[in-house]
Amino acid sequence: MKAMILAAGRGQRMMPLTQNMPKPMLKVAEKPLIEHHINNLKAAGITDIVINLAWQGDKIKDYFKDGRQFGVNILYSQEVEGGLETAGGIIEALPLLGDSFIVINGDVYTDYDVSALMQLHLQPGEAHIVLIENPPHNPDGDFALSHLPAESQKYTFSGIGRYKADFFKGLTQGIRPLGPILREKLNEHLVSTELYIGQWDDIGTPERLNQLNTRLEA
């Protein structure tokens, strides 16, 4: 199975740290954030990885190259300046990903074990996403658990999921966010969910990055 790490975002809220550096290359525990994802994927047995690039993408490519020195094989999906949003980036990379694949946001830090996603038996057109308890910056959440009524408590999308390639069937290339697609497919019962209680941090601001590094150093 292959995995895709989303790394094309502009990181506007992380300025000035992202003025000359893509957000996934910012250091957490003395390693680029995205390197933690690569190590976790490798530990789960996933060595074929696709990374999408836009803002300062050459910094990622120059650091990881083809991935061999990290024990993996990396392919890159180059996007237009400004990026294509999450779903647009996935759709652009579909020719590199195969029938079923895992996607991870490159700007989160987590100890979630993707081995669980690899064991799922998804039907054609389906997806499975990981939700987490709502952080302070997203108190209202994003999605209810799929086995509960839609009006149930909503949790925050972690940016981690597994998708069948035909989940995106009929969607044209271009700038396209993922949220509206997930909501539509949830209503069609094509998306299952789980709630993960564990380490997860969205590195959305310099303050959050500093807080995370302080915790990890303690």
How should these model regions be labeled?
Residues 35, 87, 179:
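Glycine-rich phosphate-binding loop at the start of an alpha helix
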Residues 6, 29, 51-53, 78, ...:
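Small/polar loops that bind or transfer phosphate-bearing groups
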Residues 102, 109, 115-122, 134-137, ...:
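Catalytic-core segments of class I nucleotidyltransferases/pyrophosphorylases
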Residues 61, 65-142:
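Conserved beta-loop-beta/alpha segment of the NTase-like Rossmann-fold superfamily
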Residues 13, 59-62, 92, 113, ...:
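Phosphate- and divalent-cation-binding pockets in alpha/beta enzyme and binding domains
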Residues 2, 47-49, 73, 126-127, ...:
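Residues at the starts of beta-strands that form the adenosine-phosphate
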Residues 1-58:
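N-terminal glycine-rich phosphate-binding loop and ensuing alpha1 helix
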